[in-house]
């Protein structure tokens, strides 16, 4: 069973709130999950300590069992001070390298 550490959306319309969950890779985004390991509230200021709250010990456990974090969650995990496995870091680097640059707002408007 492939396991991912990802965001599950909650909250109201136009007021997002996310749970950081460990879930089966084939499960729906907001569906069943194995364990809740944190929260993310994008409505709070970026310097607020409660914007991202993670259970570091449980995340380390799931990473050791082979769970793969999504790109956004991997950034949160690194900022929290948890060391990601080398395999995950390599995958993130490859995805970042292959990503197309976004056009600026001016260029998009003109096109």
Swiss-Prot record:
GO terms for cellular component: cytoplasm; small ribosomal subunit. Pfam families: Ribosomal_S16. GO terms for biological process: translation. It comes from the Bacteria. GO terms for molecular function: structural constituent of ribosome. HAMAP family: Ribosomal_bS16. NCBIfam families: S16. Belongs to the bacterial ribosomal protein bS16 family. This is Small ribosomal subunit protein bS16. It comes from Rickettsia canadensis (strain McKiel).
